[in-house]
């Protein structure tokens, strides 16, 4: 994998070797240099700059379309999940209301039993 070297490292390499040395196939790099980096770079454990890659408008449109399709699928899944969560929320709310009614009924029954108990106590004490 090719990585960019800093301008400082490049200038240090030029000073050490005394010349700019390239050979082999011509490749264009992001910093405008051309050539395959050779012995000097390996000697000083430097890595050549990353090659610049260009894409055509058609390739970009294909990439954009595929991304849009992927995003649409994700949006649809999210919409379905939101609907499911809303349904569950409504069910939980309904269950909560039912529990409230049950608790109120139990409270009323408890109050009635307390009143009956007081009456029984009064009758027994007579």
Swiss-Prot record:
Question: Which family, according to UniProt?
Answer: Belongs to the UPF0134 family.
- Upper lineage ranks? Bacteria, Bacillati, Mycoplasmatota, Mycoplasmoidales, Mycoplasmoidaceae
- What name does UniProt use for this protein? UPF0134 protein MPN_504
Q: Which Gene3D superfamilies match?
A: 6.10.250.40
Q: Give the source species.
A: Mycoplasma pneumoniae (strain ATCC 29342 / M129 / Subtype 1) (Mycoplasmoides pneumoniae)
Q: Which domain of life is it from?
A: Bacteria
| One Pfam family it belongs to | DUF16
